[in-house]
Amino acid sequence: MPKNKSHSGASKRFKVTGSGKVLRERAGKRHLLEHKSSRLTRRLTGNAEMAPGDAKKIKKLLGK
């Protein structure tokens, strides 16, 4: 039987760490930043950890 393909959209958006946590980018920092406060844009930097329930679904999409 052939291997299952991982979900290409999910593989672009999420990353699974060595310990099994799923990381995601925070929403709202792509464009239209001019009216957003510096405090908000700083807060949106870096990766966030997925909630356990959502992480389970994402791992299934990624085949992990």
Swiss-Prot record:
This protein's UniProt keywords: Ribonucleoprotein, Ribosomal protein
Pfam families associated with the record: Ribosomal_L35p
GO cellular component: cytosolic large ribosomal subunit
BP terms from Gene Ontology: translation
Transmembrane spans: none
UniProt GO MF annotations: structural constituent of ribosome
Coiled coil: none
Gene3D superfamilies: 4.10.410.60
Entries under InterPro entries matching the protein: Ribosomal_bL35 (IPR001706), Ribosomal_bL35-like (IPR021137), Ribosomal_bL35_CS (IPR018265), Ribosomal_bL35_sf (IPR037229)
Family: Belongs to the bacterial ribosomal protein bL35 family.
Protein name in UniProt: Large ribosomal subunit protein bL35
